[in-house]
């Protein structure tokens, strides 16, 4: 899975998705969609990756190949996003996280332990799942999450849903540069394709949930190791990124918190060569020995 040669963006997405098993679990009046990558025959430890707001499992397109085959990698489309239906309560983080935790248990078993990793809004979900399932979750890692420390500057995005063709693609590039990726050279066709697919399927209003205080409430309840990463150039955190890192370090002195140089908000995509080794290092600390 580590051989991402110069395929077309669609070929990369299709290849990685084809290597997963698709699951559906209950979510409100509908279903939650999951993908599981497993090359171990069910023996490797489980890590669940939670994407960001207005996202899908595709936010982890450069992370999944780095974790398989050492892990069983479980990625949902979070409730109200991607292919998943709306949750019973679309405003309460812990209610949504309960749906997520129940989905994990339905797929890998109620007695299976797992690590959770969340990007942006997914960090709130990861922290809440960790607080709700202290006997099941081995560690919580948050990447570029809001709700920690002082608010950053507001990021204004252009509307795209009414646009078509090249104008739509160009506007996605503008928005990716403003919000997600600091280095314009990293805004490639794959990033734009993922952004387009994700945004047109976004229904859950995640920013309010991320800023609700739920992530800090959950972090205060954690009984497991906490890790964190923020891009030095994370636009939603700007100019408060270092302050967020300092806030979390002060609140959780034993947490492993990293500031990623030259990196924007979507760190796992823009700086995969930096994020993936750090993430593997963090996960290794809680990897089961048998």
Regions found by a protein language model. Name each.
Residues 1-47, 69-71, 108-109, 253-256, ...:
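Alpha/beta-hydrolase fold catalytic core
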Residues 61, 74-117, 277:
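Active-site loop/oxyanion-hole signature of alpha/beta-hydrolase fold enzymes
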Residues 118, 122, 126:
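Gly/Ala-rich beta-loop-alpha elbow adjacent to hydrolase catalytic centers
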Residues 151-152, 167-224:
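Conserved alpha/beta-hydrolase catalytic His-Asp/Glu region
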């Amino acid at each position: 899975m580590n051989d991402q040669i110069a395929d077309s963006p669609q070929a990369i997405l299709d290849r990685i998705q084809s290597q997963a098993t698709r699951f559906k679990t209950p979510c409100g009046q509908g279903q939650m969609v999951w993908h599981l990558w497993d090359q171990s025959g069910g023996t490797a430890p489980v890590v669940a990756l939670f994407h960001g707001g207005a996202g899908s499992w595709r936010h982890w397109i450069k992370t999944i190949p780095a974790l398989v085959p050492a892990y069983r990698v479980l990625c949902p489309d979070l409730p109200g996003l991607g292919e998943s239906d709306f949750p019973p309560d679309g405003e309460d983080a812990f209610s949504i996280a309960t749906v997520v935790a129940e989905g994990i248990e339905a797929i890998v078993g109620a007695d299976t332990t797992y690590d959770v990793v969340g990007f942006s809004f997914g960090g709130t979900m990861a922290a809440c799942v960790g607080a709700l399932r202290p006997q099941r979750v081995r560690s919580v890692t948050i990447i570029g999450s809001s709700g920690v420390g002082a608010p950053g500057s507001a990021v204004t995005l252009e509307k795209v849903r009414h646009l078509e063709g090249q104008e739509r693609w160009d506007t996605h590039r503008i928005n990716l540069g403003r919000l997600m990726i600091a280095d314009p050279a990293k805004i490639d066709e794959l990033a734009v394709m993922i952004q387009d697919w994700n945004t047109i399927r976004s229904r859950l209003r995640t920013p309010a949930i991320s800023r609700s205080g739920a992530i800090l409430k959950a972090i205060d309840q954690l009984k497991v190791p906490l890790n964190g990463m923020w891009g030095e150039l994370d636009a939603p955190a700007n100019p408060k990124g270092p302050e967020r890192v300092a806030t979390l370090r002060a609140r959780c002195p034993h947490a492993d918190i990293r500031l990623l140089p030259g990196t924007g908000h979507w760190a796992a995509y823009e700086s995969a060569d930096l994020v993936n080794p750090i993430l593997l290092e963090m996960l290794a600390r809680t990897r089961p020995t048998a």
